[in-house]
Amino acid sequence: MRHKAQEWRIIMKKKTLALTMAMALVLSLAACGNSNADVAAESTAAATTEAATEAATTEAATTEASTEAVADEKSEGVMTYEEYMAADLDSEVVIEAYVQAKQSWWEDKATLYTQDQDGAYFIYNAVCSEEDYAKLVPGTKIKVTGYKTEWSGEVEIAEGATFEIEDGSYIAPVTDVTDLLGTDDLINYQNQFVAFKGMTVEAAGQDADGNDVAFLYNWDGSGEDGNDLYFNVSLNGQTYTFTVESYLCDNTTDVYNAVKNLKIGDTVDMEGFLYWYEGVNPHITSVTVK
């Protein structure tokens, strides 16, 4: 009896041990399954997040591209730059462009340098209240109705044009036209914001004592501080007259004072608007001596 009882105890212990091991295995597998599920869930969530991020990035890029693409679409009845240039002188024109700089305002008339992605438009003495003039910060989009005209080679929209402010903004990048100086292609960039690099300052005239000077007040030296500055620069043996238009950049500006400090022989880089007067006569807004 003792032997059987002991045998029975041994058998029961083995069964209990086996049952305990089986339960441990089940729990272990369950835990492992949960862990794998967690990893799978985390991987799925990460993939979903990454996909969402990529989708958002793609959408943002698409939106930006669309904005750039439609930024210069013309409204109904508005000319493209090509159509504007092809229009006859003294004909009515309607254009949309972006203010790049304001030259002056006086007695409800504003003179503006404007540009779109295709070309530039000089607007002379447009009808403009002082209140509206203050709104015409660089980049402002305007729709202009007026008459195309030409004055001493400068194609412009004549005095009396009207405009309305529209939604949109654009600042034109500077275009280096140094290599186009002296070529027939230069005029195709008329009124655009441009750069000239590596030019040499030449004598602009002489002072009262007969000494060569690097600039003149007014084209003939008849002016004084605060008037337009005229100076000559050369490239490849050709000399050109550039101007600091005092209405655009007065005698408190960096460029005005930079030109007053030029020395004959200086090498300079410049930026400004490609104005025309009996030939190229840029209105310079920046001068850097190298």
Feature-to-residue mapping (PLM):
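OB-fold single-stranded nucleic acid-binding module
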Residues: E68-K290
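Repetitive helical segments and hydrophobic/amphipathic motifs
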Residues: M23-A24
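N-terminal, intrinsically disordered, polar/charged segments of Gram-positive cell-envelope systems
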Residues: A37-M85
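C-terminal motif of bacterial Sec signal peptides marking the signal peptidase cleavage site
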Residues: S28-A31
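Bacterial signal peptide processing site
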Residues: G33-S35
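Bacterial N-terminal signal peptides that target proteins for export
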Residues: I10-L19
